[in-house]
Amino acid sequence: MSHTVKIYDTCIGCTQCVRACPTDVLEMIPWDGCKANQIASSPRTEDCVGCKRCESACPTDFLSVRVYLGSETTRSMGLAY
């Protein structure tokens, strides 16, 4: 089952989320917005199992990567009525 994976611009390019993902959903891509010149990307969300290990691994105060499961997707992203 795929889940929505959102990467925020607070990503510091540390690769912790990429290394924590057991299904290789995440990868790093070039980005000039941080010192590491890279940001996490989620090109394979169809493989996401919803374990949220990427969230747990994120060292930033505001999680740079979030996994939204099912109905949580619309509610958390402000899309629910």
From Swiss-Prot:
- Recorded protein name is Photosystem I iron-sulfur center
Q: Per the record, what are the reactions this protein catalyses?
A: reduced [plastocyanin] + hnu + oxidized [2Fe-2S]-[ferredoxin] = oxidized [plastocyanin] + reduced [2Fe-2S]-[ferredoxin]
Q: Is Thylakoid there in the keyword field?
A: yes
- Which top EC class is given? oxidoreductase
Cofactors per UniProt? Answer: [4Fe-4S] cluster
The record's subunit annotation is: The eukaryotic PSI reaction center is composed of at least 11 subunits.
Note the HAMAP family from the entry. PSI_PsaC
Q: Name a biological process GO annotation.
A: photosynthetic electron transport in photosystem I
Q: What is its EC number?
A: 1.97.1.12
